[in-house]
Amino acid sequence: MSKKRKRAAPKGQNKKKIENSGYSGGGANLSSNILKSWFPVKLSSKSDIDRNLQILRNRASDEAINTPIGAAAVNTSTLNAVGTGLTLFPRLKHRILGISPDDAREWSRRVRQEFDMWASSKDCDVYRRNNFYDLQYIAYMAYLTDGDSFALFRRKMPTSWMPYSLRLQVLEANRVSNPLLSGNTAPYGISSVEMRNTDNGNRIVSGVEVDDDGAIAAYWVSNKVPFDRIDVDGIVEWQRVEAFGPRTGMPNILQICHDVRADQYRGVPYLAPVIETLKQVSRYTTAELASAIVKTFFSLFFTQSATSMDVGDVLGNPYGSYEGESVDESHAPIVDVGEYALGAGTLNALPKGVDVKAVDASNAQSTFKPFLDELIKQVGAALNIPSEVLTKAFTSSYSASRAALLQAWDEFKARRVWFARDFCQPVYEAWLTEAVATGRIEAPGFFDDPLIRNAWCNAEWFGPAMSILDPTKDVTGSHLRVLYGLSTREREAAEMTGSDYEDNLAQIAYEREKMQELGVTESDKTISSASAAAGDGQDEQSDEKGDETDEKMLENPQRGRFL
């Protein structure tokens, strides 16, 4: 019986066809020439952030100090988010407290006056150098440069001129770190990023002590910057500062920081995403500056024909004679360079066979400006600051310039809210607690119920107003928001001018009374006509005419205030 021969399978029939699916054909492609050698690794926030913090801070600090664009980014954000300081506006919840709106306004007015007495005094600073509003500027700039900053609550005896004991001490990020060579700590793992407190078993991550749940328990603060080569007085010592008081639950130290990842305990410098680009911009700018300086030089070369004598015989040896070389004094150079000069109407006679040629240092048109503008746009996009605002160059139309301001203002307002939550509001609550405890401010039920305490402590913080390109349009928009119930006069006054609406009303009433007393009348007709003309112009203005108005607006900066 013949055996049946097995039929061979066609070649390649058993091979399964591989097809790209999902991201394997895009960002996860392993065969692309661009991506096949690119294998970045994302690890924990400790590995990605804390391990690189020291070099990030050093480089970001250098960029913020020594590069124009880096300094512009930090200074612009600080100036617009904080400026001269955020101002307190108490907003106690009178319905929860069971008091009338009039009583609530009177209490708020009293608290603002009392708080400003403490905040405007340099006694609120433990160093007695800055008031509370100046400390805001310092803390915010340190937060941008280093990624986070800290403020310690300190106490000093009240005096006749300062009835409060609360003091603030602002610290930079490098003052909070792991306590190296300390008796009650031990290294943990292979990196000094994380250590362990042997007293309670808590972990210490870059100076932040956390419990088993990951909650912050304490901060380790050094008495000076570790490894400082100038401040060598005494040894570096660390002190453990509990994050919150065990009896009151109030913070003992504030960390100004905005987290971007889960399980993050330290902040990332503001300039971290653009450090490399800023460095390249700085190098490119320096090279172009050196090239521009070289172009201003005017160089001359003496040349000789083939039949003339040696060039050394013509000009002499500019470096003098060599050691041991005999010099024939009678054989002087034919051309004394010191006798020839350039000037208007100057005529110089050169020996036979000697010629002068000028070197033109100019080259082709440089692409410096367009290339630099593109790099600055990338930097601005990463920092959420349009390039027009970053460079203070408003060369486009009014609409484009205002759009850039509005985009930047969204960034500034967000950072202002973060900063007020981390710094201003906790400081106000600590101050108000002392004011109520000492009897300078009356707040019934403040220490009895957390809900009541929160109702008394509720507040808003307003800072510098957004720059205005066309005051007429902005005031008209503000008027319409109030008219349709989208905002209040008090909020508009605070956001547009940083002023208090009730103070404005009192001053206006006084001015009108004084004008009537002196027989001066207001030109209401002129004001109404101007407002009507502005409204008609906005309704009938075409896009083409709008662009012409925009150009005139930018040419006449007196009509608006730029950043």
Segments from the language model and where they lie:
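Extended, Lys/Arg-enriched charged tracts that mediate electrostatic binding to polyanionic substrates
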Residues: 137-231
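Extended, charged amphipathic alpha-helical segments
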Residues: 246-401, 531
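Acidic/polar, glycine-anchored loop/turn motif associated with catalytic or activation segments
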Residues: 214, 379, 492
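Surface-exposed loop-to-helix/strand elements on domain peripheries
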Residues: 105, 122, 126-128, 343-469
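Extended, helix-rich architectural segments
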Residues: 1-146, 153-166
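Activation/maturation switch segments at domain boundaries
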Residues: 2-5, 354-358, 364-365, 405, ...
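Short coil/turn segments at secondary-structure boundaries
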Residues: 130, 153-155, 292-297, 390-394, ...
